[in-house]
């Protein structure tokens, strides 16, 4: 069985790491490179960087920091933000990123997933899905351009349908960003994760809601996700990655202990 992964997420805006709640009201956390190094040293399995306004601004991720991150960490990392072409992806990978993630551009042009997978291999193509639970309808809907709250919009896709669609098109991994839980630290949406897990046959990463070590355990044990992504609990040093992994290992989770 493959080891479960602990993945700190670094949202990047204007060259700094920021963090919001439910994708809004972002506060500055700090500089990119020192944070990346700290997480690698603590035992993170990989890192994810989101240039959160790249897609809504109509630009590609700011590449200036990608190579600097690659110089100071020795774990895999994934970069996302406005990647709309093979050329964009090739440049980011050439700067040292191990994976690229697409979200809003995939919704705008789903063929991009296939073209990227054919060119670079499915193993380095991640599709991020920003999903919102509508309490009135009881349905999960995919949102687009979530990095800028003034431009965020609900798409015509229901989450489970989009999960199936991106797999058909060549997604090698899916990160499910559960917007209702984002930054609230009340736990992952296990019900939604279980529904997605039932139709997701590639690695599935849970994102949004981690507040305690038990929340990570629940995601691995009850929803059978392959990785758990979190931000604020690591940024604010509420949870230490090394201690988290020791806890999970003691609970019987297959994990790489530092």
UniProtKB/Swiss-Prot annotation:
Query: Which EC class does it fall in?
Result: lyase
Record field: catalytic activity = 5-[(5-phospho-1-deoxy-D-ribulos-1-ylimino)methylamino]-1-(5-phospho-beta-D-ribosyl)imidazole-4-carboxamide + L-glutamine = D-erythro-1-(imidazol-4-yl)glycerol 3-phosphate + 5-amino-1-(5-phospho-beta-D-ribosyl)imidazole-4-carboxamide + L-glutamate + H(+)
Q: Name one Pfam family in it.
A: His_biosynth
Its Gene Ontology molecular function terms? Answer: imidazoleglycerol-phosphate synthase activity; lyase activity
Question: What InterPro entries does the record tag this protein with?
Answer: Aldolase_TIM (IPR013785), His_biosynth (IPR006062), HisF (IPR004651), IGPS_HisA/HisF (IPR050064), RibuloseP-bd_barrel (IPR011060)
Q: Which domain of life is it from?
A: Bacteria
- Cite the CDD domains for this sequence: HisF
Residue numbers annotated as active site:
11, 130
Q: What is its main location?
A: cytoplasm
The cellular component terms of Gene Ontology attached to this UniProt record, alphabetical and capped at eight, are: cytoplasm
Q: Which UniProt keywords apply?
A: Amino-acid biosynthesis, Cytoplasm, Histidine biosynthesis, Lyase
Give its localization. Cytoplasm
Q: Which SUPFAM superfamilies match?
A: Ribulose-phoshate binding barrel (SSF51366)
Q: Which GO terms describe its biological process?
A: L-histidine biosynthetic process
* Biological pathway: Amino-acid biosynthesis; L-histidine biosynthesis; L-histidine from 5-phospho-alpha-D-ribose 1-diphosphate: step 5/9
EC nos: 4.3.2.10
Purpose of the protein: IGPS catalyzes the conversion of PRFAR and glutamine to IGP, AICAR and glutamate. The HisF subunit catalyzes the cyclization activity that produces IGP and AICAR from PRFAR using the ammonia provided by the HisH subunit.
Quote the NCBIfam families the UniProt record gives.
hisF (TIGR00735)
Q: Which family does it belong to?
A: Belongs to the HisA/HisF family.
What does the subunit section of this Swiss-Prot or TrEMBL entry state? Heterodimer of HisH and HisF.
**Name of this chain's protein:** Imidazole glycerol phosphate synthase subunit HisF
Q: Which source organism?
A: Klebsiella pneumoniae subsp. pneumoniae (strain ATCC 700721 / MGH 78578)
Q: What is the lineage of its organism?
A: Bacteria, Pseudomonadati, Pseudomonadota, Gammaproteobacteria, Enterobacterales
């Amino acid at each position: 069985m493959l080891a479960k992964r602990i993945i700190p997420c670094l949202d990047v805006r204007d060259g700094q790491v920021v963090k919001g709640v439910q994708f809004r009201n972002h506060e500055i956390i700090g500089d990119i490179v020192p944070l990346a190094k700290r997480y690698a040293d603590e035992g993170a399995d990989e890192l994810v960087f989101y240039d959160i306004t790249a897609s809504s601004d109509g630009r590609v991720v700011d590449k200036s920091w990608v190579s600097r991150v690659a110089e100071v960490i020795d774990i895999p990392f994934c970069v996302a933000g406005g990647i709309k072409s093979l050329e964009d992806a090739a440049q980011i990978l050439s700067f040292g990123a191990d994976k690229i993630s697409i979200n809003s551009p995939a919704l705008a042009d789903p063929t991009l997933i296939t073209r990227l997978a054919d060119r670079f291999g499915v193993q380095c193509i991640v599709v991020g899905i920003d999903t919102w639970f509508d309490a009135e309808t009881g349905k999960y809907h995919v949102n687009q351009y979530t990095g800028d709250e003034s431009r965020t919009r609900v798409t015509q896709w229901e989450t489970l349908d989009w999960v199936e669609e991106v797999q058909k098109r060549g997604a090698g991994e899916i990160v499910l960003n559960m917007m209702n839980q984002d930054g609230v630290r009340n736990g992952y949406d296990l019900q939604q994760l279980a529904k997605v897990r039932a139709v997701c046959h590639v690695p599935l990463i849970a994102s949004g809601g981690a507040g305690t070590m038990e929340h990570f355990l629940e995601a691995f044990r009850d929803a059978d996700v392959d990785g758990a992504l979190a931000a604020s609990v690591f940024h604010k040093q509420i949870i230490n990655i090394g201690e988290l992994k020791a806890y999970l290992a003691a609970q019987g989770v297959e994990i790489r202990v530092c």
